[in-house]
A protein has these predicted regions:
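PP2C/PPM-type serine/threonine phosphatase catalytic domain
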Residues: 1-302
């Protein structure tokens, strides 16, 4: 298991004010689970200054992304590789690194532009996801040419990026790695699962309460590097003090339903504690896939 932590400090901000860095409680971990031989998940927690100051990541060489300056945003990212062998892990790593380079360069100016430019910001996030897709496809083609063993469609990954630019959380995702928003006992799934099962639900061909049991529940309809890549973007108000952002790969949600996630978030003592509690539940129930969990909270005023 790989885990990283940035603990909150003294709490002094007023309700609804932008939290300081030392008020944020951030934690992320990843675990291979009990079945898979390799962990193909990657994650990242960082703050964007002019570039990125890495607080937590599973990426092997993040130093080139780092630089300091005034904080512009906070980033949470998860990527769940598919494709077998080392291809899935390479795909998730490439996607994560590519979108972060895009965020720390092309998107640097957006946080200062104001809410009137939200559509431009969301368009840029879509472009960042498509840039990651192009990078993974290029790597897959090079691998296929070099080895003759992999097709250009054999490397793929999910990708979910949440970028907190006060007072909004902007989310772009491809695949079924989820972003949740929790406040005052209410858990909302921000992202839409891009799976064949969810497509059937949307078309009215499958009841929503049967989607999790469907054989198509984890068959991706959209992925980075896959046959179809359709980034979706959304925006969430994060001014409520005590709200929690949770992100995870499907290694968690295969074993832990939303109701239990909400219960644990409602009783959470810290981001570290809740991530470990959810991981332990998934492992106790089989740990059939790689498991990655990230949590972020701006604590309530005391």
């Amino acid at each position: 298991m790989t885990a990283f932590h940035l603990q909150s400090g003294r709490i002094t901000s007023e309700f609804g004010a932008k939290p300081r860095d030392d008020e944020l409680d951030l934690y992320g971990l990843t675990h291979p689970g009990k079945v898979r031989a390799e962990n193909q998940d990657h994650f990242l927690l960082c703050t964007v200054h002019p570039q990125a100051v890495i607080h937590a990541t599973s990426l092997p060489d993040p130093d080139e992304l780092q630089a300091r300056g005034q904080r512009l945003a906070t980033v949470m990212l998860v990527a769940d590789g598919v494709g077998g062998s080392a291809a899935g892990r390479e795909a998730s790593q490439l996607a994560a690194e590519t979108i972060m380079r895009y965020v720390t360069s092309t998107l640097r100016s957006y946080p200062a532009m104001g809410s009137q430019h939200d559509e431009d910001f969301l368009t840029a996030l879509r472009a960042a996801a498509l840039e990651a897709d192009a990078t993974v496809r290029s790597a897959a083609a090079e691998r296929a040419q070099a080895t003759g063993r992999l097709s250009s469609k054999s490397m793929a990954t999910t990708l979910t990026l949440a970028l907190a630019v006060w007072p909004w959380l902007y989310v772009v995702h491809v695949g079924d790695s989820r972003c949740y928003f929790f406040w005052n006992g209410d858990l909302q799934q921000v992202t839409r699962d891009q799976t064949m099962a969810q497509d059937l639900v949307d078309k009215g061909a499958l009841p929503a309460d049967r989607a999790a049991q469907s054989p198509f529940s984890h068959v991706l309809a959209s992925s980075i590097g896959g046959p179809e890549t359709s980034p979706e973007v959304s925006r969430v108000d994060i001014t409520k003090r005590g709200c929690v952002i949770l992100m995870c790969t499907d290694g968690l949600t295969k074993h832990v339903p939303d109701a239990e996630i909400a219960t644990h978030l409602g009783a959470m003592q810290s981001a570290e504690q809740v991530c470990h509690a959810l991981l332990d539940l998934a492992l106790e129930r089989g740990g059939s896939d790689n498991i990655t969990v990230l949590a972020a909270r701006a604590p309530r005023k005391q």
